[in-house]
Amino acid sequence: MSKSHAAYIDYALRRTTNMPVEMMGTDVVRLKDYQHFVARVFLGLDSMHSLLLFHETGVGKTMTTVYILKHLKDIYTNWAIILLVKKALIEDPWMNTILRYAPEITKDCIFINYDDQNFRNKFFTNIKTINSKSRICVIIDECHNFISKSLIKEDGKIRPTRSVYNFLSKTIALKNHKMICLSATPIVNSVQEFTMLVNLLRPGSLQHQSLFENKRLVNEKELVSKLGGLCSYIVNNEFSIFDDVEGSASFAKKTVLMRYVNMSKKQEEIYQKAKLTEIKTGISSFRILRRMATTFTFDSFPERQNRDPGEYAQEIATLYNDFKRSLRDREFSKSALDTFKKGELLGGDASAADISLFTELKEKSAKFIDVCLGILASHGKCLVFEPFVNQSGIEILLLYFKVFGISNIEFSSRTKDTRIKAVAEFNQESNTNGECIKTCVFSSSGGEGISFFSINDIFILDMTWNEASLRQIVGRAIRLNSHVLTPPERRYVNVHFIMARLSNGMPTVDEDLFEIIQSKSKEFVQLFRVFKHTSLEWIHANEKDFSPIDNESGWKTLVSRAIDLSSKKNITNKLIEGTNIWYSNSNRLMSINRGFKGVDGRVYDVDGNYLHDMPDNPVIKIHDGKLIYIF
């Protein structure tokens, strides 16, 4: 049915031929062609009630949305605009963008923070105050967070955000309102999020049905047929976050580096205690204690179970203060720092004080030592992602920075009042090369919504639970024109994943999480393909054989059809002769996978999914006694 969707897209574009490409307020900006296109379609089809902007980080989702909001009155006089956003993003980018380019709509805007404990009450209170003659346009920024907060917990408890989700799914189309969801990563943790998002945008279209069978999408054709026009898809980088990507005129080159560091004997001892504690307390599935242990360890492992919280907190504070005092008036000599900046380690001619300090710091954290060395050797500015703030996280890392003489700013939950200003200073043209501020260390608070310019190295100290979060983190630094001020030879970003290792060769929590991410991505890639093939851009570019229409009366019927996955595609099991192989998608062998090569030269993954044909002259590397094909 994509031809039918194409006819409506064509109709919307014909209706909006004269829509200006510039947006003017106190400042003027000219929209990119893809921004203008999606705005014209969404505004040109009044009965298009909802749309997902699946745009990668840095291509201007906020700008596109503000343009749409500015032109809402082209189709109806009275609008109330409700923006559901994270608190950290209200001022920048949202208010700043609106004030610059569409100040006239500020009086119509209501900002509500969906992280607020009273979010539900605030939302419905504001809904009641809206004039009955007004139409409503709801914006959900970083909608994957909103969806995640609306999922029913494993214990069956319904979360407060769910009532807002239910209201929007029932009301937007019924009352002729509009809604835009924004995300660079619309699916983060589970396939259920896809179902939730689809049913928010197209209520009731995707009932409780199994989307996958043996990790294969049951009926992709049915989904694409029924979900046409669901989203706008602007994703220039469709590669895995672990793949290298060449640069372009607008985007910096990305190179991924896996930095494996060996934990000290002391760290390994604490790590094993953390693992045992997780098993005893039943929290091993979260791996928090082990993740913290791979990052930094005190001289002892403080037990938390069956203890007064105040007593436990006091012990942590004492350990921190003891460590801080041990570094008082200590720092590396200029000679040592010059050595580190060359990318070298201390030699036999180094001072006893430098060697002693380095040894003490490395014993407690091989990761922090590695990051500090990497920052000093970097030719430009750096970002460091550390999700933990206290105990073994940012609070400790900053002590390392001080000893290594690394200038820095912090973007985390404990710098709420200063972090926006600090990032602005970090991004100033005068600091393009990191002359004033070398590094920004950020927690999950900085994973979304902010932009960094002229970054050359990102260090990721802790694996997240999903590839989407990693994309958000890396996307802070690789954005449209983010390196325009950087010298041409430095328009690159090295992404360093710091992975801890045990001396006995057993996998660490870092390696476990890496495997989890790869497992999830198999299903997500198929769903992202559905988004791509149902997008306005794909349909407009690929469906040309349609009959023009002169009204939009059939749009609602077209997009309200239920999806039926009961008639599954016929999947025939075949016995194929061939050999088992190992393969990798990276020249640096960041991930090595089992596969199968048939006698006909076709290559399959471990689940039997066809990948591609074996090249005539394949690239082969030897690793740990295995022949690894590089595809």
Swiss-Prot record:
It catalyses: a ribonucleoside 5'-triphosphate + H2O = a ribonucleoside 5'-diphosphate + phosphate + H(+). Keywords: ATP-binding, DNA-binding, Hydrolase, Late protein, Nucleotide-binding, Transcription, Virion. SUPFAM superfamilies: P-loop containing nucleoside triphosphate hydrolases. GO terms for cellular component: virion component. It comes from the Viruses. It comes from Variola virus. ATP binds at H55, E56, T57, G58, V59, G60, K61, T62. SMART domains: DEXDc, HELICc. This is Nucleoside triphosphatase I. The keyword Chaperone does not apply. Residues 42-204 form the Helicase ATP-binding domain. Its EC number is 3.6.1.15.
